[in-house]
Amino acid sequence: MTFKRRAMIATAAASALFLSPQLWAQAQPIKIFNVVELSGTGATAGTMFKSGIELAVKDVNASGGILGRKLEVTNMDTQTNPGIAKALVVRAIDDGAFAIFGPVFSGSILISQTETRRAEVPNFTAAAGALVTQQGSPYIFRTGLTQVNSMPKAARYIARNLKIKKIAVLFVNNDFGKPGRDAIVGALKTFGVEVVADISTEAGQLDFSAPIIKVKQAGAEAVFVYLNEEESARAVRELRKQGWDKPIVGDVTLLSQKVIDLAGDAANGVVGHSEMSADAPIAGVKVVRDKFFKEYNFLPDHNGIKGYQGVYMLKAAIQKVGKFDRVAVAKQLHGMTIKVADEPGVLMDVTFDDKGDIDRESFLIEIKGGKPVVKEVLPPLGKN
C-alpha cells in the first residue's frame, strides 16, 4: 500500500470519528419492529399485517424515507402466545425500537402493551378488542376501528336494512370475541333486536356442528358470526351444510379474503359491516391492493391494508413533530387528523381520539361470486 493511499484511509477514518452527532444520527435508519402472529392460530392476521407494513416501508424508503431517514423493519413471531409476545416486545425495545407494530390479537396486545408504555415507545395494532385502548396507555394506537365504533353500524344494518327482530350470536371465547359479543349485543338491544341465542365457541375450534344446531333451534331470523377467520369459514360451511338459508351477518373477520378462500361457495351471500376492505371504492386502496398482489402474489385483507396505513400514520406524526422523539410523536397522534390530501399513504382521512382509537369511513359488504362487494360507504361514527 502506498503512502498516499494510507494517508487517504487515515483521513477518512478521522472524518468518521469526528462526524457530528446530528449527521451520524441522520445516517442511521429508523428501527421499527413487527411483533406479530406468524404462526399459531393468529398466523393469518399477523402475516397480513406484517406484509402490509413491509410494503409501506418499501414505499416510504423509495420516496426518501422520513425526514431524510430510511426505515428498517425487523419481524418477530409471537406464535400467538401472549407471554412470548411480551418477551419479544422487551427485546425489540432493548434493540432500539422507535415504534412497534403488533401484536394483532387482542389477548396478546393487552399483555405486551405494558412494556411499550413503560419504555415510552409508540405501539400500533390492528386489534379490534374494545379493552385494548381502555388500559390507559398513551402509547397504544389502533390502525383500525374498535368494536365500540364498528358494532353500532352492524346492528343498525341488521335492524334497518335486514328488518331482523330475532338473532343468534355466535362468538369466540377470547379477548377478541368476548368484548365484541358484548358490543354487538348492546348495540342490537339499542335497535330493538332480540338475541335469542348467545353461543360461545373456542379459539381454533374445528367442529361447529353442535353450535349450529343451537342456532337453528333458537328460532332466529339471522345469525351474527363473530369468530377469527379460519373459524368463521368453518362456521359458514357448517351453516350451509345444515341447510341454513337465513342471513349470515358479521363484521370484518367474517367478510375477509381468508374466509372466502376457505369457505368457497358457502361464503356467497354473507353480509355485514367491514371497517376495512381491499375492495373499497377508494383510489388509494385500489393502488395498494394491486401493489400487494404484485409483491406477494396474494390479495390483502383488512389487516394487510391496516398494516400499510399504520406506517403512514407514524410517518405523518413524525413529520408533524419535525424530529425523532417518541414521546412527542405519541402526544402528536392523540387528537390528530391525518388527511389523504396531506399524506396519501394513509389512504383514508382518519382522526385519533385521546385513547388512541380512530374514526373513519367503513363499509357494508356482501360476498357475491366469491368476491366482497361494497354495497355502501358509511361515514365516520362521529358524523352519523
What spans do the regions from the language model cover?
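Extracytosolic ligand-binding ectodomains
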Residues: 2-11, 25-384
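Repetitive helical segments and hydrophobic/amphipathic motifs
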Residues: 13-15
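Sec/Tat signal peptide C-region and signal peptidase I cleavage site
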Residues: 19-25
